[in-house]
Amino acid sequence: MSLANVVVIGAQWGDEGKGKITDLLSRSADVVVRYQGGVNAGHTIVVDGRVLKLHLIPSGILYPDTICLIGPGTVVDPKVMLGELDMLLANDIDISGLRLASSAHVTMPYHRLLDLAMEKQRGDRRIGTTGRGIGPTYADKSQRSGIRVIDLLDEQRLRNRLEGPLTEKNELLEKIYGIEPLDGEAVIQEYLGYGQRLSKHVVDCTRAIHSAAKARKNILFEGAQGTLLDLDHGTYPYVTSSNPVSGGACIGAGVGPTLIDRVIGVAKAYTTRVGEGPFPTELSGSLNDQLTERGGEFGTTTGRRRRCGWFDGVIGRYAVQVNGLDCLAITKLDVLDEMDEIQVCVAYELDGERIEYFPSSSDDFARCKPIFETMKGWQCSTEECRKLEDLPKAAMDYLRFLADLMEVPIAIVSLGASRDQTIVVEDPIHGPKRALLSA
């Protein structure tokens, strides 16, 4: 499978299975770039029976000839990152291809403490943060008081940069939240140590990407979370603090939009959400339990049980529009194997009126009632299917319905966690932009 410059995004609320799809596409990539988010995201990859859980490091690290860049739009927790590197080394995985943007911002210990304290203070108004300090890190970045990776490489610079923010954060911790202040010298020494270990990976990300582009290398941009968690385009305020949408790749990696050739969206065959916020197709009772257990719907980062519901075609169409999707990868089709009936949300009812768009107000979204189309289930295993024609007719009908509903081709179908449990319907990079699986 040849590759151009491609963005892979989540078309729902995250946890769509982007890690597996990125892993599949990374085989042909020269460079993989993570462009936003931090350790609040997580992806699981199964390789030769080994389960590898990564939060910050791109899936492409599993390919020794691939350069993996953590871009300036990310926020880096160096302690977690080094833990991931140690895990990869313990699994005999070469990490020499890892590159870390010198301008990426760093999650400091006070960010994590403030994240948890602020969420606790919100009470019933909590937003469902992972508690990893992501929001406070991005807030400091916007307020121009953040610490960057490059600051960890020079002791005097780190001391100068940290003096004001640490004093301010300690006052907040102690006087507002009643938390013991941090020892500034201990923080400095700890983070200088992280900088020393990471220094060999630190680069000017923009120069590295444009050098690769000039050399006509294939570049894969990997987003974290999903479209409905985007700070500007998601279910605000129940969102993340960055831009997972495809446009975020330009800002978070430092490239112009003309460098991007294709955008691939990843969506589950049903829908999940972690944390708070409206979720029109959410299920309860035995159906919810069935999806949770069969789909292993527990967060990679937090371990929290994910909320499960039927496929929502309204937010799917919205994701197609916001990201300019060229094609879709549908994951976890096998999780629906035992269902006798499957429902798909095709529209909402809002205050007695049928609407077919995603409302920008979360209050309006919370009042939306799903309007479903009911489809026949296939009630047999799809896990061993390797070609489209191997799928039962009802499964084919379901995929065709999703493609028509979202008005975008389905190029990849995933039927399990392993690499080989995948049907590549057509080349997701160079395939025609047509209605796939049409009659």
UniProtKB/Swiss-Prot annotation:
Major place of residence: cytoplasm
Residues binding Mg(2+), per UniProt: D15, G42
Binding annotation for substrate: T300, T301, T302, G303, R304, R305, R306
Subcellular localization, as worded in the UniProt entry: Cytoplasm
Coiled-coil regions listed in the entry: none
GO molecular function: adenylosuccinate synthase activity; GTP binding; magnesium ion binding
Record-annotated active site: D15 (proton acceptor), H43 (proton donor)
UniProt pathway annotation: Purine metabolism; AMP biosynthesis via de novo pathway; AMP from IMP: step 1/2
Classification via Pfam families: Adenylsucc_synt
Catalytic activity, reaction form: IMP + L-aspartate + GTP = N(6)-(1,2-dicarboxyethyl)-AMP + GDP + phosphate + 2 H(+)
SUPFAM superfamilies reported in the protein's UniProt record: P-loop containing nucleoside triphosphate hydrolases
Any one annotated GO CC term: cytoplasm
Gene3D superfamilies attached to this UniProt entry: Adenylosuccinate Synthetase, subunit A, domain 1 (3.40.440.10), Adenylosuccinate Synthetase, subunit A, domain 2 (1.10.300.10), Adenylosuccinate Synthetase, subunit A, domain 3 (3.90.170.10)
Positions that bind GTP: 14-20, 42-44, 306, 332-334, 414-416
Cofactor note as given: Binds 1 Mg(2+) ion per subunit.
Keywords per UniProt: Cytoplasm, GTP-binding, Ligase, Magnesium, Metal-binding, Nucleotide-binding, Purine biosynthesis
GO biological process, one term: IMP metabolic process
InterPro entries registered for this protein in UniProt: Adenylosuccin_syn_GTP-bd, Adenylosuccin_syn_Lys_AS, Adenylosuccinate_synth_dom1, Adenylosuccinate_synth_dom2, Adenylosuccinate_synth_dom3, Adenylosuccinate_synthetase, P-loop_NTPase
EC number: 6.3.4.4
Family membership: Belongs to the adenylosuccinate synthetase family.
PANTHER family (alphabetical): ADENYLOSUCCINATE SYNTHETASE (PTHR11846:SF0)
Assembly notes: Homodimer.
Function: Plays an important role in the de novo pathway of purine nucleotide biosynthesis. Catalyzes the first committed step in the biosynthesis of AMP from IMP.
Name of the featured protein: Adenylosuccinate synthetase
Gene: purA
